[in-house]
Amino acid sequence: MINFSSFYQQIADSNLQHWLETLPAILGKWQREHKHGNLPKWEKVLNKLHYPSPDSVDLVDSVTIGTGEQLTPGEKEKLENLLRLFMPWRKGPFHIHGIHIDTEWRSDWKWDRVKPHISPLQNRTVLDVGCGSGYHMWRMLGAGAKRVVGIDPSPLFLCQFEAVKRLSGENHPVHLLPLGIEELPPLDAFDTVFSMGVLYHRRSPIDHLLQLRDQLRMGGELVLETLVIDGDENAVLVPQDRYGKMNNVWFIPSVAALMLWLKKCDFTDIRCVDTDVTALAEQRRTDWMPNESLVEYLDPKDITKTVEGYPAPKRATIIAVKNQPNQDLS
């Protein structure tokens, strides 16, 4: 069973210590009641990941753990077979003991677009909401963050993250908790909060923005990356059914509308730092994620549209700062 006690110990003397009033009970309940059919199998695989500490770890330019020279060909093959039991791998890529986990998403491209615009992460306490398997968390740590906490309710993402962490050798200050943001109390403690690829999955985007605000300290920075459409501050796409074959897409605003929402939620210094149409090379089928991907979600006759006829995925990154609220929006 995955143990969260080291996280409790690390935050006991930090500005997150008041979280300990509720978090152990919430995670204890999750461990008792979570019934995902594959979780016991994945935990058994995790228990087989007994490998020497890597001879090197690079989190600055990539997520590379080990050079591959420490393992025999047989050991390397065994490790790759174990890691493949956690398929599909969606966010990455990872390089582990010479094994290239070629994930569906080139998450390093997104990081390269975002990183130049954010406040330096040196010595910051960071929250990554909807962190997936944790790729960006490792890059945040490589950028100098003091502590990185990710939340994502998916048990597969949790196990993928735990696999990478166990193979990294050290007890790095990076932790993934199997929670949704609605399970977090208002912590008012993080220096930077990331929400990337989450907003359009939320039934109430304004509530999501308020929940993000509640996790930031006063003056803390929000990094929000999400799908957008073209248009003015009144433009919002509400898909009738599916968007890009996804049945959990609720609201896709224009950049202007999104900035207005943030202003209404008492954020300041709001600025759009990047817009980017998702390229077929950034999200694609791979040997580690053999299912449908972006090319199947687009109109084969016109890739500027989804199969449903909506504009193809376009993403924007917005940065904003938590301000003293003028009124109680919660």
Swiss-Prot record:
tRNA processing in keyword set: yes
Entry keyword set: Transferase, tRNA processing
Top class in the EC scheme: transferase
EC number(s) on file: 2.5.1.-
Positions of carboxy-S-adenosyl-L-methionine binding: 91, 105, 110, 130, 152-154, 181-182, 196, 200, 315
Catalytic activity: carboxy-S-adenosyl-L-methionine + 5-hydroxyuridine(34) in tRNA = 5-carboxymethoxyuridine(34) in tRNA + S-adenosyl-L-homocysteine + H(+)
Molecular function, one GO term: transferase activity, transferring alkyl or aryl (other than methyl) groups
Leader sequence residues: none
Pfam family, one: Methyltransf_9
Domain of life of the source: Bacteria
Recorded family membership: Belongs to the class I-like SAM-binding methyltransferase superfamily. CmoB family.
PANTHER family to which the protein is assigned, alphabetical: METHYLTRANSFERASE, TRNA U34 CARBOXYMETHYLTRANSFERASE
Protein name: tRNA U34 carboxymethyltransferase
Originating species: Shewanella oneidensis (strain ATCC 700550 / JCM 31522 / CIP 106686 / LMG 19005 / NCIMB 14063 / MR-1)
Lineage: Bacteria, Pseudomonadati, Pseudomonadota, Gammaproteobacteria, Alteromonadales
Record gene name: cmoB
